[in-house]
Amino acid sequence: PDARFCVFPGDFVETGTNRNSEWEWERWFDEAVRPVIMQMPIVPTDGNHDDSSNQNYTYHFNTDNQFKENAKVKPQFDGTTYSFMYGDVLFLVYSLQDYWKGSYNLSTLTSTYLTNDVGNWFREQVAAHPEAKWRVALVHKNVFSGSGHQEDEETPLFRETMLPIFKDCEIDLVLQGHDHCYEIIGPVDADTRTPILNAISDVETVPMNMVSNMTGKKGGVFNVNDGTLYFIGATCGTKRYNPNHKLTMEADYEKHKVENYYDLFTGMFGQPGRPSYSSFTVDGNIITVNSYKVYEGMEPMLFNTFHIKRTREHTPYSEKAHKTLEQMIQEYGTVKILHNGNMLIVRENIAYDTLGQLIYDNRD
């Protein structure tokens, strides 16, 4: 009851791809969440089940549409990518559903829409809010997951395109949906795609259960100074997936392409078996997450508490661009001096100036 708003990471309905899905939206608003929306605003993230040819999702929420208006490659729907500040936290809501817009290739793991439009938008938001002590991204489809969607063919593309953006923007936490399972992943080093083990402490060892707690871990403090924590809070509905076994993850290497994938699951990882939700309390350099199961006619039952910690301030994005000129040259390729004396950092048909701003992108 003390929450300031409710974050919902997508899939409000099951049959959104059907043009006749309005009855599900009516049930969602009138029955499922009426007590919630009468007390607080909802921060929506569009899920793959919410997307429909009649754009029904966009008629139910009033979110900012500047991203679509300014994007070089336009997303399908209005208001699916937006940001806002609340307290010390910058929230960046975005969608991975449009990765195929513009030019993309699942073999080379490239998407001009994600790398350019979404990536540049992330950088603009971070640069515009240097006062933010925390940077939290919200998305439906997973960058990392260990359940029903671990094998999705587009997920490696999401990692290849989004991890450099998360690193560049020093994103602390990514709240995901899609997988209907409870998963604490990381903090992940964006370059090596491995957990930063010295950033994890106070994780309790508990009896392992093949469904409710695959890792046999509970609680923990996760320091995100040098990496990003990924969290999926299971589901508040009735559609549930079970966690994948370590052997399954190893066998699926050719699909997910991440070495020692199971090691990324550094906290509790399992299926609560009941509708669940998590509360987030921000207090200075600590975010406390309490996760609850819901039983009809009973008080919610706390089943896990963990803490996210940041002990170092973010680098202001403008300063970071100045400091990383040599790294940018190494990453993006050669340096060209223009006739007016300005310097560009160029790779193929894309160029940045020395502040890291995109100058042109002629890739199709």
Report each predicted region and the residues it spans:
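Acidic active-site catalytic centers that drive phospho-/nucleotidyl reactions
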Residues: 11, 50, 95, 178, ...
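Alpha-helix capping and helix-coil boundary motifs
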Residues: 20, 128-131, 324, 363
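Metal-dependent phosphoesterase/phosphodiesterase active-site architecture
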Residues: 55-137, 142-148, 164, 169-173, ...
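Divalent metal-dependent phosphoesterase catalytic cores across multiple superfamilies
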Residues: 1-46, 50-80, 116, 123-127, ...
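Alpha-helix C-terminal capping segments
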Residues: 1, 129, 343-346
